[in-house]
Amino acid sequence: MGGPRALLAALWALEAAGTAALRIGAFNIQSFGDSKVSDPACGSIIAKILAGYDLALVQEVRDPDLSAVSALMEQINSVSEHEYSFVSSQPLGRDQYKEMYLFVYRKDAVSVVDTYLYPDPEDVFSREPFVVKFSAPGTGERAPPLPSRRALTPPPLPAAAQNLVLIPLHAAPHQAVAEIDALYDVYLDVIDKWGTDDMLFLGDFNADCSYVRAQDWAAIRLRSSEVFKWLIPDSADTTVGNSDCAYDRIVACGARLRRSLKPQSATVHDFQEEFGLDQTQALAISDHFPVEVTLKFHR
């Protein structure tokens, strides 16, 4: 997967569609499983939301046999003119409660190159990141040298196509500070493993209100380092209910990726307003809104 022919096909598809952009979202769909996807109202709206993205992370997937995911993919492919596929993690969690990370992607826009589950040597994460490398249109410029644990042997740089690495996190609320900080260690691990720093960290970080307070940010390396650009501001509200919290975030790094960010495209996707739902109807879908960003690429 992800070879020159696949990349060329993706570029042709983007050219034919009259766009050179990649819309990426992250959606915590509360307790996603068979009952939610089989509900006609919920299932159809979820499918339409995800079909609006070229690449989307879904969290809180509770579907070990992938029956709900299979049904979801059928619904997405029935409402979209493009064909979608998926890649998912194993069920993750420290106790009997498990969740999966799910990436849904448009096959003519990106392809999966490689995946791995972060080993989490310090056991910081309740649900360790399932890291996925996608092939995407390149920006054509060579990136500067990357930081690495192996100071004397910098990792190799991608020679042609840009590889876009997505790192998901659904943080345990009361461990959010430690888990968000530990994403910096994931960043170093990806550089050592794959030799690229073009990464998006995304998901429900629980990064606001009582879980991450203003005084906590200084201890979070992912926030204090200038390497990372936080795209969803602290002032955002990513919750459907009456709270006002910026739980869901997208963080970018890598010179080429940061140059590819479409200005002002990072936003909260208010599906309640989009579909004309009342709060009860919206909460039946999820207690979180998706967050998103668009990457633009040179033709």
UniProtKB/Swiss-Prot annotation:
Q: Does the keyword Disulfide bond apply?
A: yes
Coiled coil region boundaries: none
The conditions that induce or repress this protein are given as: Up-regulated by inflammatory cytokines.
Q: Does the keyword Hydrolase apply?
A: yes
GO process terms (BP) = corneocyte development; DNA catabolic process; DNA metabolic process; hair follicle development
List, from the UniProt record, the residues annotated as the active site of this protein.
Answer: 99, 170
In the UniProt record, the signal sequence range is 1-20
Report the EC code(s) recorded for this entry. 3.1.21.-
Please provide the record's keywords in A-Z order.
Answer: Calcium, Cytoplasm, Disulfide bond, Endonuclease, Hydrolase, Magnesium, Metal-binding, Nuclease, Secreted, Signal
GO cellular component annotations of the record: cytoplasm; extracellular region; nucleus
The SS bond pairs are 209-245
Cofactor(s) annotated in UniProt = Mg(2+); Ca(2+)
Q: In which tissues is it expressed?
A: Preferentially expressed in the skin and up-regulated during keratinocytes differentiation. Highly abundant (at protein level) in the stratum granulosum.
User: GO MF annotations for this entry?
Assistant: calcium ion binding; deoxyribonuclease I activity; DNA binding; DNA nuclease activity
According to its UniProt record, where is this protein located? Answer: Cytoplasm; Secreted
What task does this protein carry out? Divalent cation-dependent acid DNA endonuclease involved in the breakdown of the nucleus during corneocyte formation of epidermal keratinocytes. May play an immune role by eliminating harmful DNA released into the extracellular environment by damaged epidermal cells.
Q: What is this protein called?
A: Deoxyribonuclease-1-like 2
What high-level taxonomic lineage is stated for the organism? Answer: Eukaryota, Metazoa, Chordata, Craniata, Vertebrata
